[in-house]
Amino acid sequence: MADINSLVLSGRLTRDSELSYTESGMAVLRFSIANNRRMKKNDEWIDYPQYFDCVIFSKRAESLNDYLKKGKQVVVSGSLKYESWQDRNTGDKRSKVNIFVDNLQMFSSGSNTIQMQDSDVNSLTNHKKEDVVKDIDIVDDKFSEDIPF
């Protein structure tokens, strides 16, 4: 039986996304998210930032690159992928965990959101990016204030 490897995470991009291609031509989009873990200490709420590296592949990577900019608020869902390697310069063993993104939701600067999921990938292959953005549902953000728990 396979174990469960699934997560949902929200945060803001720490830098613009970076699009690259593998030797076989597959698009790879990389970006990082800052996520604040909020804890109460001495009757005061304190944010503890955490940083996560994310990866998106294929057509979705190409279509999202222009939209994922520093400061953009997103919610991602996907799975964790552990990677390890040996540093070429020092010989030290290195490792990190990436989030392989299956679904992504972008929050616009207003109170609307744009959602893109696996089902959207097929429509992206036959349309210009401008046409696809027009067809995406806009959803009101009813939770613009902090949740008190």
UniProtKB/Swiss-Prot annotation:
Key word DNA-binding present: yes
Coiled-coil residue windows: none
GO CC aspect terms: nucleoid
Keywords: DNA-binding
Example GO BP: DNA replication
Domain SSB: 4-108
UniProt GO MF annotations: single-stranded DNA binding
PANTHER family with a match to the protein in the record: SINGLE-STRANDED DNA-BINDING PROTEIN, SINGLE-STRANDED DNA-BINDING PROTEIN, MITOCHONDRIAL
Subunit structure, interactors included: Homotetramer.
Protein name per the record: Single-stranded DNA-binding protein
This protein's encoding gene: ssb
